[in-house]
UniProtKB/Swiss-Prot annotation:
This is Large ribosomal subunit protein uL23. GO terms for biological process: translation. The lineage of its organism: Bacteria, Pseudomonadati, Thermodesulfobacteriota, Desulfovibrionia, Desulfovibrionales. The keyword Lipid biosynthesis does not apply. One of its GO terms (cellular component) is ribonucleoprotein complex. Coiled coil: none annotated. The keyword Ubl conjugation does not apply. Belongs to the universal ribosomal protein uL23 family.
Amino acid sequence: MEYANILLKPVISEKATMVKDAANQVVFFVHPAANKIEIAKAVEKAFSVTVKGVRVVKHKSLARSRMGRVTGRIPGYKKAYVTLAQGDKIEFFEGV
């Protein structure tokens, strides 16, 4: 898998901001087939930082229903919590 296709987009949420400030971690939505090693190499190549560790969370797709009828599905996704080396930073929305 190519590194450009692994990182889909950064997660911008309250929890992701707290984790970034407290533990020097950044959170990304990643390709469902990507593993920890590929994610670490993609982040290092894309942002020129050193990665200390990667934790991965998979969310299953869920059935959406209205009035007892199943009308569709909410797609599943995969998130990666990437821990950066001390002194390294990835700035997405600093100063906004």
